[in-house]
Amino acid sequence: MKIGTPLSPSALRVMLLGAGELGKEVIIALQRLGVEVIAVDRYENAPGHQVAHRAHVISMTDGAALRQLVEQEKPHLIVPEIEAIATDMLVEIEAAGLAEVIPTARAAKLTMNREGIRRLAAEELGLPTSPYKFADSLAELQAAIDGGIGYPCIVKPTMSSSGKGQSLLRGPDDVQKAWDYAASGGRVNQGRVIVEGFIDFDYEITLLTVRARDTAGEVVTHFCEPIGHVQVGGDYVESWQPQAMSPAALQRAQEIAAAVTGNLGGRGLFGVELFVKGDMVWFSEVSPRPHDTGLVTLCSQRFSEFELHARAILGLPVDTALREAGASAVIYGGMEEKGIAFAGLEEALAVPRSDLRLFGKPESFKKRRMGVAVANGESTDQARERAKLAASKVRPTRT
């Protein structure tokens, strides 16, 4: 493996499709390894735009615009960091030999919506999941619930991110509202939802799974320690590592994650979401990229999920070792405003073993994730207390 010099004829060029806070960290990790990075997003001054060598603003669901940009920039690798991408065009780009898609164009296409990956996991691989059906109309949704899914259940757009459009239904009175909310929350392909039966789980985890080359050049699967997390409305608000699990549950979680990521193939880090009850484990979702709950790895592992993704992408060896217990807590914008400021940083960073990441998003919304606090501790409980305390000290303000 050779890496050249950025901004020179020898440069290794990587294009990130999606330049949010997770993409920003991947860009920084790639640049530390001498890679020339092109960041692409749908709006100007996205977090990753602020640190990349070059930045572009396009609609990534526009296949023609995407191909034109790839032909212009000539990246060696394309790294999708979001779901809303013209994945059919990625398949064409890869088939034409214009660039290698990470982990593969097929993986990007399958995981761009919940239908593709759920059918792969449950119907092709036979992995345990919640009971589910897909619906294209309010009537189909009601029929799916009445036909066996039952209440309580969860309705999600087949394509959305960060919990957008997701609802918990406790009875018939919730169906219309959930359908309307899902239609407004989906990124594309609006009007199709997945309805899932509720699993009585003890906790949910993200198992960061890395497919990387070893010193012999073979792709090997590695696992990080499990990450526990709390979600509100489908959106992560805090995470911690490690999450205590029984040996049997951990082994089953790793088996499920290996089966899914092995089928998707390629190189890179995958965020595999799982439900756990005792020794039983159910597959929920997978993202072929760093996961928001994995922000905790900025303080808990020797190499963060972003550094692991960068190394795996480049065909380099990885080390998934846990360094010490850590936790993360989200900092919300709290207001509808452009160009907000943040106060209370002195108090936040006075919390023992704490650190902050302010993402630099150009516009704040009340529940938009604008930053994260991370902290270490003697235990995950202590780390969680510190991370939440540090996050609570940060006060978004109008300038």
Swiss-Prot record:
GO terms for biological process: 'de novo' IMP biosynthetic process. It holds the Pfam family RS_preATP-grasp-like. The keyword Oxidoreductase does not apply. Pathway: Purine metabolism; IMP biosynthesis via de novo pathway; N(2)-formyl-N(1)-(5-phospho-D-ribosyl)glycinamide from N(1)-(5-phospho-D-ribosyl)glycinamide (formate route): step 1/1. ATP binds at residues 114, 156, 161-166, 196-199, 204. GO terms for molecular function: ATP binding; magnesium ion binding; phosphoribosylglycinamide formyltransferase 2 activity; phosphoribosylglycinamide formyltransferase activity. Transmembrane segments: none annotated. N(1)-(5-phospho-beta-D-ribosyl)glycinamide binds at residues 21-22, 81, 292, 361, 368-369. It catalyses: N(1)-(5-phospho-beta-D-ribosyl)glycinamide + formate + ATP = N(2)-formyl-N(1)-(5-phospho-beta-D-ribosyl)glycinamide + ADP + phosphate + H(+). Keywords: ATP-binding, Ligase, Magnesium, Metal-binding, Nucleotide-binding, Purine biosynthesis. InterPro entries: ATP-grasp, ATP-grasp_carboxylate-amine, ATP_grasp_subdomain_1, CbamoylP_synth_lsu-like_ATP-bd, PreATP-grasp_dom_sf, PurT, PurT/PurK_preATP-grasp, PurT_C. Coiled coil: none annotated. Residues 119-314 form the ATP-grasp domain. Mg(2+) binds at residues 273, 285. It comes from the Bacteria. SUPFAM superfamilies: Glutathione synthetase ATP-binding domain-like, PreATP-grasp domain, Rudiment single hybrid motif. Residues 370-399 are annotated as: Disordered. One of its GO terms (cellular component) is cytosol. Its EC number is 6.3.1.21. Involved in the de novo purine biosynthesis. Catalyzes the transfer of formate to 5-phospho-ribosyl-glycinamide (GAR), producing 5-phospho-ribosyl-N-formylglycinamide (FGAR). Formate is provided by PurU via hydrolysis of 10-formyl-tetrahydrofolate. PANTHER family: FORMATE-DEPENDENT PHOSPHORIBOSYLGLYCINAMIDE FORMYLTRANSFERASE (PTHR43055:SF1). Homodimer. Belongs to the PurK/PurT family. This is Formate-dependent phosphoribosylglycinamide formyltransferase. The gene is purT.
